[in-house]
UniProtKB/Swiss-Prot annotation:
A motif (Probable selectivity filter) lies at residues 277-279. Keywords: Cell inner membrane, Cell membrane, Ion transport, Magnesium, Membrane, Transmembrane, Transmembrane helix, Transport. It comes from Photorhabdus laumondii subsp. laumondii (strain DSM 15139 / CIP 105565 / TT01) (Photorhabdus luminescens subsp. laumondii). It is a multi-pass membrane protein. It holds the Pfam family CorA. Mediates influx of magnesium ions. Alternates between open and closed states. Activated by low cytoplasmic Mg(2+) levels. Inactive when cytoplasmic Mg(2+) levels are high. One of its GO terms (cellular component) is plasma membrane. Belongs to the CorA metal ion transporter (MIT) (TC 1.A.35) family. CDD domains: EcCorA-like_1. This is Magnesium transport protein CorA. Gene3D superfamilies: Magnesium transport protein CorA, transmembrane region (1.20.58.340). It is found in: Cell inner membrane. The lineage of its organism: Bacteria, Pseudomonadati, Pseudomonadota, Gammaproteobacteria, Enterobacterales. It comes from the Bacteria.
Length: 316
């Protein structure tokens, strides 16, 4: 899908191609899962060659942040959650050339959707492509901050469940959620660090206008403040995971202890029963009137003796 926005009275307005408006009037060209005809339209009308899918997947710095004859290129991760609430990072390719911003991505992203909503009601200060780029990065960092706050809230709830140590369906769900929060935290950290690298490149190489340079530095300071919070989330998740595994080990030890005690308690009675189950001809007790109740009593006594001994030693 191809969308384009022009600047009118310092506001971003979507171009209406049906009404004859052209890409040459745009300040920002946004492509989401573009068809081949969308790519050709951008190339024919603006002379801009867009990044390919394999280029979006490159992770080395030289392929993600560079400048050539087609403009300044920055590839950056953006966080998202799909319809099934699975977290992920999608790469967005930014290109600035001739005062125009191009964005290319393979899916709709929350940060872009939020920025477009805000753009309807707010005006740009300088009205240039760099300002739109910085605003998108700023919106992304705000979103990541909200995700971190949500993880704190979820971990607080999980902490209460795990620290109670009551294992059951709720405990199993808590462990699954804990692993999910760790995965989200890792993706947020990856996104923060990637954005930090992108902004450092722009500060050094993009010759940002004064206002956008200060905005980039402000975003970098925000990232620096969020990274320790993200690190503390990993520590909290690790602590809760270790606590959960500790409770599981304790419960398993209790179960093993019960089986051990049962086996030890029943071993002497089994020995007595086995003795009187032998088919020897000369066994005086077999002809004794009280032989059967005597054997039962001996089995009970043989079982109680180790139990009472363990109890006295506080092993139970």
């Amino acid at each position: 899908m191809l969308s384009a926005f022009k600047l009118e009275n310092n506001r971003l307005l979507r171009l209406e191609f049906e009404e004859g408006e052209k890409l040459s009037d745009s300040l920002w060209v946004d492509l989401v899962e573009p068809a081949e005809q969308d790519r050709l339209q951008v190339q024919n009308e603006l002379g801009q060659i867009l990044a390919t899918r394999p280029e979006l997947d490159d992770i080395e710095a030289s392929a993600r942040f560079f400048e050539d004859e087609d403009g300044i290129h920055v590839h950056s991760f953006f966080y998202f959650e799909d319809a099934e609430d699975h977290a992920g990072n999608a790469t967005v390719a930014f290109t600035i050339r001739d005062g125009r911003l191009y964005t290319l991505r393979e899916r709709e992203l929350p940060a872009f959707r939020l920025y477009r909503m805000r753009a309807r009601n707010q005006t740009l200060v300088d009205g240039n492509a760099y300002e739109v780029l910085m605003d998108l990065f700023e919106t992304k960092i705000e979103q990541l901050a909200d995700v971190i706050e949500n993880i704190y809230s979820v971990l607080e709830s999980l902490s209460r469940v795990i620290m109670e140590g009551k294992q059951g369906d709720e405990f199993d769900i808590a462990l699954s959620s804990l692993a999910e929060q760790e995965d989200i935290s890792w993706k947020v950290r990856l996104c923060l660090m990637d954005t930090q690298r992108a902004l450092n490149f722009l500060v050094r190489r993009a010759r940002l206008p004064g206002a956008q340079l200060e905005q980039a530095r402000e975003i970098l300071r925000d990232i620096e403040s969020l990274l320790p919070h993200n690190e503390s989330l990993f520590q909290k998740v690790n602590f809760l995971m270790q606590a959960a595994m500790g409770f599981i080990n304790i419960e398993q030890s209790r179960i093993i202890k019960i089986f051990s005690v049962v086996s030890v308690v029943f071993l002497p009675p089994t020995l007595v029963a086995s003795s009187y189950g032998m088919n020897f001809e000369f066994m005086p007790e077999l002809h004794w009137t009280f032989g059967y109740p005597g054997a039962i009593g001996l089995m009970i006594a043989a079982g109680l003796a180790p139990y009472l001994y363990f109890k006295r030693k506080n092993w139970l």
